[in-house]
Each structure stands twice: as C-alpha cells, then as structure tokens.
Amino acid sequence: MNNMVSISLCMIVKDEEDTIERCLDSVKELCDEIIIVDTGSTDKTKELARRYTKRLFDFKWVHHFAKARNFAFSKATKDYILWLDADDVILKDDLQKLLLLKQTLDQSVDAVMMPYNLAFDSSGNVTFSSKRHRLVKRSRNFQWIGAVHEYLAVGGKIIRQDAAVTHRSTKTEKSDRNLKIYQQNLKDGKTFSPRDLYYYANECFDHSLYDEAIAHYEKFLKSGLGWSEDCISACDKLAEIFIRKNEQDKAIKAALRSFEYDLPRAEHCCKLGYIYLTQQNIDKAIFWYDLATKLDIQRAENTGGFVQKAYYTWIPHIQLCVCYDRNGNIEKAFEHNEKAREYAPTNPSVLYNKEYFEKRFSKS
C-alpha cells in the first residue's frame, strides 16, 4: 500500500516569462498538480505555463496578494499544497530531501516550515535567510492574510524541514508596487494593522523615504502588538537609518532597543561595533564584535525571523582584525583574519588582509 502524500503546487504570477520555466523545471518532479494563477500578464508567461499544466486560471488583480493566493489555494485538489514565487527554485539537493519527505510525511502534520534562502555571497554561501510555512495540508483550509507582504496563518502540528527554497530574482531594480499599494490604502483612509505599519515602514526604508519610515516604525513599536521578530527588525532598520543620517547616538539607542525583545543578535552587535569603530572607540567596538562571534546562529534561525549569516560567521572576525590592527596587536589581528578566512576563503577583504599580513610578517 502506497501512503505517499500528493502535492499541489500553487503559484500566482504576472509577467514572469524570464523565470517561470526555471522555477517549474526545478519542482515538477515533486508535484502531482501544478496550479498557476495569472493576475494580468502581457508577456509569454501564460504560454510558457501551459507547457507544464492545464490548470491555468486568470484572476483579476485587486491590489491584494492574499486574495490572489487564496484563490490559487482554492483550486488545489491534492493532500498538501506547496507554494512558490516564479523567481524561486528548488535546488537538486533540496529536491531530493523533499522527494524523501513526500514518501515519509505523516499525514497528521499540518504544516512544514522550511528555510527560504534570499541572498548569497560571491562564493554562493547563503547570507540572508528566513523560515516559511511552505507546505500545508489542504484540508485545513489555511488562509493567506494581508494585501501586501501577505502571510499564511497556520496552526496545529508543524514540523521543520531543512530542505530550502532558493530565491533567484533576475530583477535589478526595486519595484515600487507595494509602496504604491500602501500609499493608496493610506489615502483611502484604511486602518493599518501593526503588521501593515511595519511593512509600510520597510517599503519607505527601501525607497529612502527615511522620515516616513521612522514615523511608521515608531508607531509600530509603540503599538506593542507586533511580532517580536518584526520589532527586532524595526529596531535594526531604525539604527541603519540613523547611521545614514549621521545621527550616531540615536543609532546606538535603536540597536540597543532590540534587546528589549530578545537576547542580542549578531546583526545588532556588529552594527554597534561598526558605530563605535567609526567613532574610533576601539575597545567598545571590540566588545560588540567579540560578542557577535559567541552568538548561536541556530537559535536565531529557529525564531523564524530573518537571519544574516555573515554576521554570525566572518564579518565580526574581519572587523576584529581591523580593530586589533589599529590597536597595534598584529597577532590578534592576524588570528581573526584567519578565522574569517575559514568562513569566507575567497572574500576580497580577507584575501587583501592575508597579503597585508604576509608582507608585515616578512619584514619582521
């Protein structure tokens, strides 16, 4: 008797001719059903999608991502639903893990949380990731919520799986689509939830509307109703804004404010180290960078928030290299560059430092 679960892939797309085949080729072996919901493509997206599935539906765009995704989910007929964006792929190693999961998944599981790898360094190492409820039981009828930066509201039995979805966008310019949706909602007098406040502030940040971003991050934080990971991220973004505005004291306070919500994260420790280093306060810079080297990335990843892996690996070490070099402790500086080289052996700064130390030591 074959108890292997069946999987529906659900996607919403618009003008994705450059990426949709790459995405579907990477996942077609896993899925028993492919559902594509098109929200108004004017390119060859629909023509390309028809090569993979007959289950292609049109959905009039109403400036609401959750409604489009819920429509796609409503068309699924298999045991579980997998969702992807057209610029996502599943790499071969991750596909093998998911094929095994498909064979062994206990049907009492309601949702599977998986890594979402969003950015990479020049060597292909993951630098920015988060977790997503990526595979969900269809019969639970979980719903998407939110016009923009929508999320899937899940409950019940949730397991973690280390097979990742990889984001591989081909677009170089930041879209202002989400910003315009939020601005129209504001103009229409719609009430923003704490989550809306946070993501609208993020859109303002991404488009360098810093004063507007500050106002909405503050409104979000003062609501006291935000998810702790979003609160931590808001503090980080506030600190970054104040650094860019050359308001260092405010940047320090914003970074420290993140500690109200959880134990320190390496991202914020490195930010504090950076501020103190620019102020030539080397001892304080060393303190914060050193703390970053001692923090557990696994703990951070298990929170479900965004994690910038470089801050848990090579960045604090290369910055400690700079700090100790300025302090005249050449041995310590060399030691930390070697630590950084273990994590990022081809990083240009690491290689430059390696050559620098070789010259220094050859003269002594």
Language model segments and positions:
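Catalytic-site signature of metal-activated, phosphate-bearing donor transferases
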Residues: S6, A66-F73, L84, I90-K219, ...
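Acidic helix N-cap motif at the loop->helix transition within catalytic regions
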Residues: D18-E21, D43-Y52
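A conserved acidic beta->alpha catalytic loop
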Residues: S26, L30, D38-L48, W61, ...
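N-proximal low-complexity "stem/linker" segments adjacent to membrane-targeting elements
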Residues: M1-S26
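Conserved donor nucleotide-binding strand/loop of the catalytic core
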Residues: E47-F71, K75
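Short aromatic/hydrophobic "clamp" motif used to bind/position activated sugar donors
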Residues: I81
